Amino acid sequence: MAAKRPAAGEGGGKAAAGAAAAKKRVALVNITNVAAAANNAKFNSATWAAPVKKGSLASGRNVCTNRVSAVKSASAKPAPAISRHESAPQKESVIPPKVLSIVPTAAPAPVTVPCSSFVSPMHSGDSVSVDETMSMCDSMKSPDFEYIDNGDSSSVLGSLQRRANENLRISEDRDVEETKWNKDAPSPMEIDQICDVDNNYEDPQLCATLASDIYMHLREAETRKRPSTDFMETIQKDVNPSMRAILIDWLVEVAEEYRLVPDTLYLTVNYIDRYLSGNEINRQRLQLLGVACMLIAAKYEEICAPQVEEFCYITDNTYFRDEVLEMEASVLNYLKFEVTAPTAKCFLRRFVRVAQVSDEDPALHLEFLANYVAELSLLEYNLLSYPPSLVAASAIFLAKFILQPTKHPWNSTLAHYTQYKSSELSDCVKALHRLFSVGPGSNLPAIREKYTQHKKFVAKKHCPPSVPSEFFRDATC
């Protein structure tokens, strides 16, 4: 199994090719020579792949352009003669960010200030006489205040100060240091007001009237369409979690090259795990399974899905067209054509919108950082024990914590719409925090490189070494 991925600037000359050769990315090849290891053993990606040149981010990373000409070349000539980049224009392999609309919260009520009883002494045709003004002031007097029209202003201020001290009963002995805010200490979760997120009835895409019912349906559906959490130990004999992670890392690059939407990637991983939960497979056919699952997901999500020949090409024609179609039929039959499955991306889109309603963090930083954390979770086999909605909520929690380490990441609005308390997110947040801090590994660079690009640039965010335990305590009334 191999995926040749020439550099985007290969047709530009030998100088560009030499510069691209300095940075190499290995893709998948036949891994029959890899000895079976423990489930958590680390595999060097060099045993999976042949070296492939890789261009810089500025010129577009490993872009597969001009699909039609590539497919014709793949079908008319043998694999070694295929060249898809000799005359193809370059394009940037970055999925455009999807900026969510932010529904502004209700503005605070204006503060009413009592009108002054003084009238401007300027003479004009519309001015009010002093007698009329005095009569109006007399009729508007309140029994709680003493109005002095011509008296000394100092006596008025003294009277008001005495009344304020009596009513408020301000103690001069109060310790001010106890109320002093400490910037270094994490703030506890407070009982705040729940913001209305579903109040925009003009945009039909937001489905304001049905949003709550849709969320409840997705929460119910995720329990029925989840993969097994122990299929590596009970079903698979020749495949381990490290091989699964390398396959998903390669699929991330394929999705980037063909500019597939993020939902396609999440669905692909869901199909792979569900199929592996009930079918034993050897390592020679693992990449074939990944390609077939991405083909199914692309047909479901994409407007213009890549053709079968393009997926054959991306594997360096390791598999024939009939083999891909045969595996596609096998996956669909096992899934009983139930290809609609809630993923972490489905919930994350909703949770990001909820978090942005009353959040002070930059909207794009929060969105990109939460998406980066959620995509990292795809590589980790052990995180299959958490439902997608919990992973999405934990990604929001961790992203908000990274952006503002001293502020409580959770609030009443997020707890209401996600239906998760901060204490329920503790284990998953800690697992994601370790994954974010340590990283997926040098042999799994695709996701980190994707979110290091200048349009996102959140993969190198500084993360505190630990999450304070106070943040996982539920708020009490």
From Swiss-Prot:
GO terms, biological process: cell division; G1/S transition of mitotic cell cycle
Cross-referenced Pfam families: Cyclin_C, Cyclin_N
The UniProt record lists the keyword Cell cycle: yes
Cross-referenced InterPro entries: Cyclin, Cyclin-like_dom, Cyclin-like_sf, Cyclin_A/B-like, Cyclin_C-dom, Cyclin_N, Cyclins_cyclin-box
Record flagged with keyword Plastid: no
Assigned keywords, A-Z: Cell cycle, Cell division, Cyclin
Domain of life: Eukaryota
GO MF, one annotated term: cyclin-dependent protein serine/threonine kinase regulator activity
A GO cellular-component term linked to this record: nucleus
PANTHER family: CYCLINS (PTHR10177)
Protein name: Cyclin-A1-2
